């Protein structure tokens, strides 16, 4: 099997895997660039000497400063929580594409407001207010983009295409981690030094805003809203096939059958998906989607993203530039491994197996880091030029090893699964619920991480290690493998027991449904061989 080999749910023309679907996914993923950048730059910006001086951090007690920093960071997640819920309404009434335009505008307004902050009259309030608006923008976008991409994607590359969303997140994060290293080493600690990282937020948001005028609406949303002619045009353009092509005919029939079934079972209308929550199978799917983000945030990733200087200081890394450099390398490792996950792991190795590997390896790394901090107490060293011991170097190695386990597993896979697991009538609501869960747990982590490090010290790492172990049990018993399964067959996938064999069983069913004659012919041939052997 070659690196980019694909497991198709049915014979697929090569024309389907064309530049159009990848380009649309890339443009939509400018949303994740702005999310990744905002998640990464804020922690190191708060550590810039110019920012500390501008807002007089030296006058705060350690507890008061931790509270201020956690508020600056966490209001963004609070806004994102509500933005992800607002996206359900905008998705229903405006569609996926126009929703992206609307949320990019909200983000741009929020980013512009942040630039008005200063250390005198206006104070830090514009940053807090702007981050609330920016959070609403990224919350809505985090809901829309995985849905949009999954509805455009052929099943064999759906994980890869939704993975572009995660790649955008890592590219934005990489820039966010390195930009403060750059301004800290090349600029004097003036107001401009900390304003530049805030201003750069406008770039990915502007690209998303402009690009959203070019990309088409989701064909599945168009079919669901009675715009059949436009839907056919978009689908044929996206697949690079004629309307009469067998692949197009089959895909449209699957979409129609799915819509008809849910029109009978759930009905159409803005409130109908809420009524579907009465069904236990829908409740269960919502629960699973939310829990994936509990386990993702329970890995410790957002404690590191938002408070990387604090995290590295706890290991024993001192000095502003050294901390920024270490954080920047963390961003590089994440991006490289995201590319590996995107090109190979997510659609070939599969979702479940990667989650198992990531949780097991990541937990072991966290146990080691916590044990080192408990024994050596490196965070108590105050000197800027303090040298790392061999144990400290090993702890940093295990930190990057944790990154290597986490990134190609828990970083993007929960988004992929949540983009796949809901049907057409509950997909927007389901993704809104999943995104809201992500931002809720994100808020909890970002709000309390500074206080956790003050109170728990090395125990923070043991806490995250324990949660990663618990996630293994959850995945084994409750999350089926979704790779290569058509969106229209997800209901059947989640009905099959045992969970660990569900994908294999359903793929066999799908192949039989499409090739009953070939299956019967194969059985007849087996009978003839058996009869011949018996005769001999």
Curated annotation (Swiss-Prot):
PROSITE patterns: MFS, SUGAR_TRANSPORT_1, SUGAR_TRANSPORT_2. SUPFAM superfamilies: MFS general substrate transporter (SSF103473). Its main location: membrane. Residues 48-74, 120-131, 182-195, 307-327, 374-389, 457-458 are extracellular. It is a multi-pass membrane protein. One of its GO terms (molecular function) is carbohydrate:proton symporter activity. It comes from the Eukaryota. GO terms for biological process: quinate metabolic process. Belongs to the major facilitator superfamily. Sugar transporter (TC 2.A.1.1) family. This is Quinate permease. It comes from Neurospora terricola. The gene is qa-y.
């Amino acid at each position: 099997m070659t690196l980019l080999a694909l497991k198709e749910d049915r014979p697929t023309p090569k024309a389907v895997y064309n530049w159009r679907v990848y380009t649309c996914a890339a443009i939509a993923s400018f949303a994740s660039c702005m999310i990744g950048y905002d998640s990464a730059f804020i922690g190191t910006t708060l550590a810039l000497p110019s920012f500390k001086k501008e807002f007089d951090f030296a006058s705060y007690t350690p507890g008061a400063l931790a509270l201020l920093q956690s508020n600056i960071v966490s209001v963004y997640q609070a806004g994102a929580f509500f933005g992800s819920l607002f996206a359900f309404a905008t998705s229903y009434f405006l569609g996926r594409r126009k929703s992206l335009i609307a949320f990019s505008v909200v983000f741009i307004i929020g980013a512009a407001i942040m630039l008005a902050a200063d250390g005198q009259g206006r104070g830090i309030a514009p940053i807090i207010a702007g981050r609330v608006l920016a959070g609403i923008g990224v919350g809505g976008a985090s809901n829309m983009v995985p849905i949009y991409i999954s509805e455009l994607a052929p099943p064999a590359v759906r994980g890869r295409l939704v993975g572009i969303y995660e790649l955008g997140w890592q590219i934005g994060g990489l820039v966010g981690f390195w930009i403060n290293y750059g301004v800290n080493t090349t600029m004097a600690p003036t107001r401009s030094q900390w304003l530049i990282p805030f201003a750069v937020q406008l770039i990915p948001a502007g690209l998303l805003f402009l690009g959203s005028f070019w990309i088409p609406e989701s064909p599945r949303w168009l079919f669901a809203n009675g715009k059949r002619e436009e839907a056919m045009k978009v689908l044929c353009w996206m697949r690079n096939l004629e309307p009469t092509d067998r692949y197009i005919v089959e895909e449209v029939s699957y979409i129609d059958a799915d819509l008809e079934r849910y029109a009978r079972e759930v009905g159409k209308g803005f409130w109908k998906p809420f009524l579907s929550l009465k069904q236990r199978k829908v409740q269960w799917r919502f629960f699973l989607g939310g829990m994936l983000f509990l386990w993702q945030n329970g890995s410790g990733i957002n404690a590191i993203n938002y408070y990387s200087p604090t995290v590295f200081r706890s290991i024993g890394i001192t000095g502003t530039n050294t901390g920024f450099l270490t954080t920047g390398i963390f961003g590089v490792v994440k991006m490289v491994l995201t590319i590996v996950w995107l090109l190979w792991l997510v659609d070939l190795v599969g979702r479940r197996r990667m989650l198992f590997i990531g949780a097991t390896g990541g937990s072991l790394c966290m146990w080691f880091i916590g044990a080192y901090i408990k024994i050596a107490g490196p965070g108590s060293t105050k000197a800027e030029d303090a040298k790392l011991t061999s144990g400290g170097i090993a702890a940093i190695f295990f930190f990057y090893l944790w990154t290597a386990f986490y990134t190609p597993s828990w970083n993007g896979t929960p988004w992929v699964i949540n983009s796949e697991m809901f049907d057409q009538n509950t997909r927007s609501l389901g993704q809104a619920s999943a995104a809201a869960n992500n931002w809720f747990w994100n808020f909890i982590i970002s709000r309390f991480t500074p206080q956790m490090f003050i109170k728990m010290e090395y125990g923070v790492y043991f806490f995250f290690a324990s949660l990663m172990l618990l996630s293994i049990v959850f995945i084994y018993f409750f999350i089926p493998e979704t790779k290569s399964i058509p969106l229209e067959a997800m209901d059947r996938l989640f009905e099959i027991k045992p969970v660990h064999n569900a994908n294999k069983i359903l793929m066999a069913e799908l192949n039989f449904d499409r090739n009953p004659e070939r299956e019967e012919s194969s059985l007849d041939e087996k009978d003839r061989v058996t009869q011949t052997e018996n005769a001999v």
